[in-house]
């Protein structure tokens, strides 16, 4: 017996008049890609989504078709026209699916919510086993005020605890949503969203709730673009969960990984964990004659590896130096060394990596620090260099998009490494990340199709990564 499909429906029919951009807001650029591309990517990569339908307004059809083709979004099997209202777009999707079984699960999402967490899709799909309609919502945090718009006076202030803010996706059994729209299209009923239409047309139906995330914002006003860009700059731990896939790591077997700074610390652990998945690894560091601050040194090392393997699939730069001193107390030589290792070295690695990764459509991974968001006293050069690494990553991600090369940056919380111990001494147990956790997280980023992101690794991640590592090291 064939299982019923899970179909993602992305509503991309808006024109974005409130945004004031002069073009539909789903084409706003954030972190190197349009909002629509980010959203399609989430559904494309979700293992439970079988196919995707995009609902477009007519003038954007060719542009969406081009985006889908260039990105290779294989799950998108239809781009259909929507209508003036949101309900017209949903109705168009229902009509396109009229030959599908009634129990087909539909996950309907706004194209302009590009920060959707993968687990929300999973929870919606699971909840449809109990309900025929599901909404995603978060508790209201501000006081809700019921206003008379004619007099501009407060009518009442309801109890906030009973009110939630709706988001998307909204999920439905196809048969239920079709039945609701059959009644709705007869007229006389107003609905602001698909769940409200189900509630008004089918009062016997219970609508389940999945708890959303505050970061799942909708791009509506110009300030939302700024907020979304900042959220993409610092992806929270749930984003790491989104891209973590043990299967993809096993798919990296026999791929070639080069780690600059691989002789100790996080770099050494990346090599150790990578070997567990059958990845061919090469460590470059001063101990084997490679100076990250010397581009000729890196060029020679990469050429040697390529001569042996005939390819390089992934490159990681973990090389770093941290002087815990005021700027005034640092010697000129220490300043130059810090810049060369922490920033110039990253540039050298990126420049040298390009032709090799272009050949394999590979991945590059750099490392930043929480200090990139705000300069820290006693390590001004280090923190400013790490801010530069973030900006470099985001810029290069856009330059490399046409060549299908991925570049990301991992931002680990305080990690138990020799460099940190040397700078700060012995710190309390349980306050520092295990470098193996950071190593595993780094490999999952390499295995993903993400690009242009700064991905946090936090202590909470050890809760689930430690179980994976325990099985790996049995």
UniProtKB/Swiss-Prot annotation:
Give the UniProt record's GO annotations in the biological process aspect.
capsule polysaccharide biosynthetic process; isopentenyl diphosphate biosynthetic process, methylerythritol 4-phosphate pathway
> Which terms are listed as keywords in the entry?
Capsule biogenesis/degradation, NADP, Nucleotidyltransferase, Oxidoreductase, Transferase
EC numbers: 2.7.7.40, 1.1.1.405
| Protein's UniProt keywords contain Ligase | no
Give the start-end ranges of region Ribulose-5-phosphate reductase.
250-474
Q: How does activity depend on pH?
A: Optimum pH is 7-8.4 for D-ribulose 5-phosphate reductase activity.
Q: Where is this region: Ribitol-5-phosphate cytidylyltransferase?
A: 1-238
Q: Which GO terms describe its molecular function?
A: 2-C-methyl-D-erythritol 4-phosphate cytidylyltransferase activity; D-ribitol-5-phosphate cytidylyltransferase activity; ribitol-5-phosphate 2-dehydrogenase [(NAD(P)+] activity
- Cross-referenced Pfam families, in alphabetical order? adh_short_C2, IspD
Catalyses which reaction(s)? D-ribitol 5-phosphate + CTP + H(+) = CDP-L-ribitol + diphosphate; D-ribitol 5-phosphate + NADP(+) = D-ribulose 5-phosphate + NADPH + H(+)
Gene3D superfamilies registered for this protein in UniProt: NAD(P)-binding Rossmann-like Domain, Spore Coat Polysaccharide Biosynthesis Protein SpsA, Chain A
Q: Which PROSITE patterns match?
A: ADH_SHORT
Instruction: Note the InterPro entries from the entry.
Output: CDP-ribitol_syn, IspD, IspD/TarI, IspD/TarI_cytidylyltransf_bact, NAD(P)-bd_dom_sf, Nucleotide-diphossugar_trans, Sc_DH/Rdtase_CS, SDR_fam
Q: From the UniProt record, give the pathway where this protein acts.
A: Capsule biogenesis; capsule polysaccharide biosynthesis
Please, which domain of life does this record's source organism belong to? Bacteria
What is the protein's known function?
Answer: Catalyzes the NADPH-dependent reduction of D-ribulose 5-phosphate to D-ribitol 5-phosphate and the further reaction of D-ribitol 5-phosphate with CTP to form CDP-ribitol.
Q: Which family does it belong to?
A: In the N-terminal section; belongs to the IspD/TarI cytidylyltransferase family.
The record ties this protein, via NCBIfam families, to:
PRK00155.1-3
Q: What is this protein called?
A: Bifunctional ribulose 5-phosphate reductase/CDP-ribitol pyrophosphorylase Acs1
Q: What is the lineage of its organism?
A: Bacteria, Pseudomonadati, Pseudomonadota, Gammaproteobacteria, Pasteurellales
